[in-house]
Amino acid sequence: MADDSGTENEGSGCTGWFMVEAIVQHPTGTQISDDEDEEVEDSGYDMVDFIDDSNITHNSLEAQALFNRQEADTHYATVQDLKRKYLGSPYVSPINTIAEAVESEISPRLDAIKLTRQPKKVKRRLFQTRELTDSGYGYSEVEAGTGTQVEKHGVPENGGDGQEKDTGRDIEGEEHTEAEAPTNSVREHAGTAGILELLKCKDLRAALLGKFKECFGLSFIDLIRPFKSDKTTCADWVVAGFGIHHSISEAFQKLIEPLSLYAHIQWLTNAWGMVLLVLVRFKVNKSRSTVARTLATLLNIPDNQMLIEPPKIQSGVAALYWFRTGISNASTVIGEAPEWITRQTVIEHGLADSQFKLTEMVQWAYDNDICEESEIAFEYAQRGDFDSNARAFLNSNMQAKYVKDCATMCRHYKHAEMRKMSIKQWIKHRGSKIEGTGNWKPIVQFLRHQNIEFIPFLSKFKLWLHGTPKKNCIAIVGPPDTGKSYFCMSLISFLGGTVISHVNSSSHFWLQPLVDAKVALLDDATQPCWIYMDTYMRNLLDGNPMSIDRKHKALTLIKCPPLLVTSNIDITKEEKYKYLHTRVTTFTFPNPFPFDRNGNAVYELSNANWKCFFERLSSSLDIQDSEDEEDGSNSQAFRCVPGTVVRTL
């Protein structure tokens, strides 16, 4: 068996394990440092204070908090210095006073220190403000439910935002006025930044209206009448512009002058910049969209920063405002004042508009030969700009009654005038209303085209024109498209006659238009129409007096005016109409009406040509003027307006 390790000669001497300790002070060749004390032994007492194992007391905890707070104050002051260096002075809300704005621009910290605190929670306000957080990032958005609200952003009562909670900074009792942090570039003016942020609110129009009232002291609605459509044109416009650069205000007068006939310009300066109010009358009518594009170019602002509406021309208060501000040094006026301002501010114009005279309206309708109610109302309303009686008519609450009365009276005068005239005077009266001389030859050429001898036609036409009994009716018959209706309609148009139709024969009043006519036309008589005339209208065709039933009026006795009839039926070839053969003079148009290659009528039967026809053949038709009338009519023009007597002193 092998020997145990570490044993030799078991049984003699020491046996088993033993510990050998060797101390090596310096290896061979090691140099010993001169400043090292080789003889001093390290006892370990110099490492006692490396770790503080003593109990933590309350005073040491306060020291740590004080140190942290001092560090936070130092960091906060450094950040504020950077903000003031790169962001500029903060801008306060427009709802504050000017003194507060100036104070805030000097020092935002000074503005935050106040003896009287503003309430932290405010009610809904018209304007919206942007605020800058302590960290300098982003915007603090304002939420609004149905309208635009303003919140006074300050430090919450729980000690501040997240950053301030970490630093432990106590800012209770201090409010910070915050400003917008531009992302692209630094704003040139704090006021420009404020107006741009204001225009981002939800109800832009309400914000602009509120700012206008704050600047000018009156509502913008009091000066304008709103147009719903942007395409409606008008010559006069009221424009309010916001956020305009001050350099444009100096040149705006020269820029607007070439485009306008009148301009009333007012400039005001507020914390946002320049605000413009202008009343302008352009040389041509413009729509709102056109005005917006024009002024946006001149003022160098977007069109959503402008309020554009036409002025309230019927308001005396609005006219007085423009008049009073126009004569003050607060406005610049170019051109002559509009007539609607002068009319409502000059005393004599105001007195002239106070009373409406129906006689002047009737005289105007009579002179212009207007008897339709709708036409009277429309045309007379357009005279309101220069006619005092028309302005009084527009201001009246009885316009419908006045229009109806005017049309009724005008028809009465016209009817009485017509019945008073002979056919000779009537033809001359109708010819005096037609301009131009015309040519009578196309009428004669058309009759020859229809194989009608002109001399026999002229003799029968003269008897018809004067309403000779048994010769009071002329019938133009023939195939379709031969020009029968064209020939008769042109003649009736010149003579100012009326047209009746058998389609209304079921009514007792279908012949009522004959009462107020000088001549008449029955177009396209069919078989039932001829039968009706043969049965009931023989006396009327004779040209003798007969009674006519009128609606809502008693029967009236009249002599039938000269009557023209067009038809495709030749009654001279019908034996059953033998009683009409002697009462109706018949002419046949057998040939189609000719047209040129462009579709125009070869024979023009215009009013001017008929005028020349009657003037040329007046002696043959027995309608020539007498010797007393050759020098002109000595009758006085009709006048329904009472005259005035000029009394001499």
Curated annotation (Swiss-Prot):
Any one cellular-component term (Gene Ontology): host cell nucleus
InterPro entries in alphabetical order: Helicase_SF3_DNA-vir (IPR014015), P-loop_NTPase (IPR027417), PPV_DNA_helicase_E1_C (IPR001177), PPV_DNA_helicase_E1_N (IPR014000), PPV_E1_DBD (IPR046832), PPV_E1_DBD_sf (IPR046935), Rep_E1_papillomaV (IPR016393), Znf_lg_T-Ag_D1_dom_sf (IPR037102)
Motif (Nuclear export signal): 106-115
Record location of the Glycyl lysine isopeptide (Lys-Gly) (interchain with G-Cter in SUMO) cross-link: 559
Gene Ontology MF annotations: ATP binding; ATP hydrolysis activity; DNA binding; DNA helicase activity
Residues at which ATP binds: 478-485
Protein name in the entry: Replication protein E1
Phosphoserine: residues carrying this PTM: 89, 93, 107
Organism listed in the record: Human papillomavirus type 6a
Gene name of the record: E1
Reactions catalysed according to its record: Couples ATP hydrolysis with the unwinding of duplex DNA by translocating in the 3'-5' direction; ATP + H2O = ADP + phosphate + H(+)
Main localization category: host cell
